[in-house]
């Protein structure tokens, strides 16, 4: 995208001849560019609320968010699932949605798909003069917290394949977490973010002094992280949004499945969802399965995310074993207690959904909380919402 940069010459190169040994040593034979964007930089991710970034800042944030893992800091290890030999092919009956068109033209919305009555009815990508030049149908998109729901779906398959007894199985057979608040907890308490760890973690952050930056660094394994929780004590079993709970769930599946972990991933995404392109979770480099080297950050194409969501819908509507798992976690959904947390000055989690069900968002604003509508929400405005009985 040369329109975003301008070619420059390194200062030291201006005084060197091409025959000078220092010419190559200083990389003067290479082209150098600097961006011509007006970017507002943030210490971490761009805040999700109360900011009005310009287009250039959004371009940079999208690069950092989605392209940096493949370019500046390439992913070297991953748990990757190959495409299905018979991928699911969608039928389409497209209609125009003026509201969605306007959002794509005016906002940072990158991609929008609507699937109803067995077919895609809206299929849009941001215009080329916005973000369309950075995304194609085979572009792998970063999940952020949508990876939490992917982990839950894998857990359902691990249970249905007999590796884990049920959602109430206790984590009392995993030596890695002994002498921590997580030992002997029910799997479902971790899935529902009710581990009693509110004094220690929130979202991706440690609340107590720590030498670690956060709980979702792809270069750190569970053995490293769990050392921060030695001799920790369980607190109240209330909703506490934490990436670490999900990291534990994924790595407990890894522990229970052992050499068959990749088979469970294939069962979930290749056989069930019939993905067209590969999908993957991060894998911690220089680590091992015994140390807990799976990471919940997930990547898939826009259509493969839809294929996975459709597989969930099919499981529910066909009352499969995994469908029963999805129904069970919905029946045992909890309130996120955002109002109570706000009154006492605590952090609240995405207030447009007031309930939580095993790594799914529930009780969306304007929708009856008894209605089985569950969704996935990831940082940066990612949403996959499934109406299980009306789709």
Predicted regions mapped to residue ranges:
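Active-site helix/loop module of the DD-peptidase/beta-lactamase fold
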Residues: 161-198, 228-231, 257-300, 315-320
């Amino acid at each position: 995208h040369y329109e975003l940069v301008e070619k420059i010459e390194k200062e030291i190169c201006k005084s060197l001849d091409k025959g000078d040994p220092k010419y190559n040593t200083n990389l003067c034979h290479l082209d150098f560019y600097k961006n011509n964007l007006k970017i507002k930089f943030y210490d971490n991710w761009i805040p999700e609320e109360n900011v009005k970034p310009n287009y250039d800042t959004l371009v940079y944030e999208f690069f950092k968010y989605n392209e940096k893992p493949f370019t500046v800091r390439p992913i070297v290890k991953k748990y990757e699932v190959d495409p299905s030999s018979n991928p699911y092919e969608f039928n389409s009956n497209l209609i125009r949605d003026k509201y969605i068109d306007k959002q794509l033209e005016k906002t940072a919305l990158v991609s929008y798909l609507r699937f109803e009555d067995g077919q895609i009815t809206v299929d849009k990508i941001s215009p080329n003069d916005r973000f369309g030049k950075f995304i194609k149908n085979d572009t792998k998109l970063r999940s952020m917290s949508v990876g939490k729901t992917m982990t839950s779906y894998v857990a359902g398959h691990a249970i249905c394949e007999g590796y884990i007894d049920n959602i109430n199985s206790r984590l009392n057979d995993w030596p890695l977490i002994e002498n921590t608040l997580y030992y002997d907890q029910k799997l479902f308490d971790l899935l529902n973010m009710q581990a009693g760890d509110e004094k220690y973690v929130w979202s991706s952050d440690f609340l107590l002094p720590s030498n670690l930056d956060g709980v979702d660094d792809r270069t750190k394994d569970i053995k490293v992280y769990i050392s921060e929780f030695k001799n920790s004590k369980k607190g109240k079993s209330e909703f506490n949004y934490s990436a670490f709970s999900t990291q534990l769930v994924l790595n407990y599946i890894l522990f229970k499945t052992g050499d068959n972990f990749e088979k469970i991933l294939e069962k979930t995404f290749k056989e069930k969802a019939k993905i067209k392109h590969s999908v993957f979770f991060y894998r911690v480099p220089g680590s091992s399965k015994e140390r807990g080297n799976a990471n919940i950050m997930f990547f898939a194409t826009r259509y493969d995310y839809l294929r996975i969501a459709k597989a969930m819908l099919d499981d529910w509507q066909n009352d499969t074993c995994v469908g029963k798992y999805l129904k069970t976690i919905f029946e045992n959904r909890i309130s996120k207690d955002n109002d109570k947390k706000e009154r006492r000055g605590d952090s609240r989690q995405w207030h447009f959904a007031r309930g939580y069900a095993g790594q799914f968002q529930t009780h969306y604003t304007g929708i009856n909380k008894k209605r089985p509508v569950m969704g996935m929400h990831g940082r940066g405005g990612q949403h996959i919402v499934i109406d299980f009985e009306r789709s």
